């Protein structure tokens, strides 16, 4: 473990190779990606059952496919797009159709998706306008986009990077705080492509965080719950205008 952490510290922040180094953590109970499981469950709860046969859910930045068990019964063809091949292999084992690609240049046809989910990925992209344009492009008119990401301010940087890494809630170097995105900016970017995004704050339960910290390597049953404050973590949903192609 120490050798792996030393290697991660030797590469730049937000380097996608870190996810390959941490591949064994995707489905490790109580491991380094534990909170991503909570976020995936909360994200999936915002996705309604498929409204038509053959409906497509595009999971942008799917990682190891953590949303799969939470959307499996909703009637979607679950397509996961990610740069990390190791994570995609794990996602495929859980029923996700894997596509190796960049969320800023999705290798998918326009209007293919009934739902686009972009969870814990927007704070990692270096081209936010291009990424939002691509997420909107593959969404069919009337389709739903679901996001969660990290706000850009001093508090979010302290909690997510400084305290989060020090306390073991985030792998070292996994975030580059300069890429965090404010809700109003994200709302404006989606609006340019005919998607009206509504956002709300979200936070992990305190009990879940404490159990995760104290019971490393064991399931913690933590949850993400809504809050009125978007200062650190927030979720968003929006529909694409039916007139937009």
Question: Each predicted region: which residue ranges?
Answer:
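Conserved SAM-binding loop and adjacent beta-strand
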Residues: 28-47
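Short, flexible, mixed-charge acidic loops at enzyme active sites
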Residues: 156-165, 210-216
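A C-terminal cap/extension of S-adenosyl-L-methionine-dependent methyltransferases
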Residues: 188, 192, 196-245
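N-terminal, positively charged/glycine-rich alpha-helical extensions of SAM-dependent methyltransferases
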Residues: 2-27
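Conserved SAM-binding loop
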Residues: 44-48, 55-157, 236-238
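Feature marks short, surface-exposed loop/turn motifs that line or immediately flank catalytic pockets
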Residues: 25-26, 153-156, 203-207
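Soluble or luminal CAZymes and related metallo-dependent hydrolases
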Residues: 11, 38-43, 127, 178-182, ...
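Acceptor-substrate binding/catalytic loop of class I
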Residues: 149, 168-185
